[in-house]
Amino acid sequence: MKKNKWHLHRAGVLNFWYYDEEEFYFADGKLLLRGSNGSGKSVTMQSLIPVLLDGKKSPDRLDPFGSRARKMEDYLLGEKNVVAREERTGYLYLEYKREGVEQYLTTGIGLRAKRYSNLESWYFVLYDNRRIGRELFLYEPSFSMEDGKEQKIPLSRKQLENRVGNGGRVVKTQNEYLELVNKHLFGFENPDSYEELVKLLIQLRSPKLSKDFKPTVIYEILTNALPSLSDEELRPLTDTIENMDQTQQQLDQ
């Protein structure tokens, strides 16, 4: 068994949905969110996973039932008749920790939304052991003259690039982010295999899994999620079959 595996250690949000800034700690890679129906457990979890695994932010990713009713920018800006907000910048991130050692790695997404405009996003991986909210902050502190309170102004993409420096990567596209997460955390030989893993997680999280999927369908889902074998891995089997064929031919003669 491989030692020192990465475990989910902490999740964080800044300026997203009803959160100004919040952290959620995992225990041995597990997180329990408690609350009454409608308190936001599902929205919080689905805004983090699987979004932060591959960077895809389509509406069906944010709803376990696959609904496309609400977009990521809706959660960032809030409902217009409830919140008088026309633009907002926020961050989502996941922090991983090596088992048994003080080694950390963080993956995250920056989001900027304007009412009636397309969502802007950028992605980052922090791999020099700095931690969000400790050695690196996703905001710039500012003092408000109006209410006399300190404000936290989220960093722009350029500001984040300057903060991260050589201790990580800040990229502009979802595909680049997916490849970085796979490279630094999961180690699949190709991104396609990693994408299949994420698809499997999405299928298995369905609240109606036991109702809608027969055992044969679940078997098919799990089978399709298995990585394909390379020619090198198949060679011993093909060699054995060829040897068996040759032996049979010799016996027949």
Q: How should each PLM-predicted stretch be described?
A:
Residues 1-160, 191-192, 200, 221, ...:
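Extreme N-terminal "head/tail" segments of very large remodeling/mechanoenzyme assemblies
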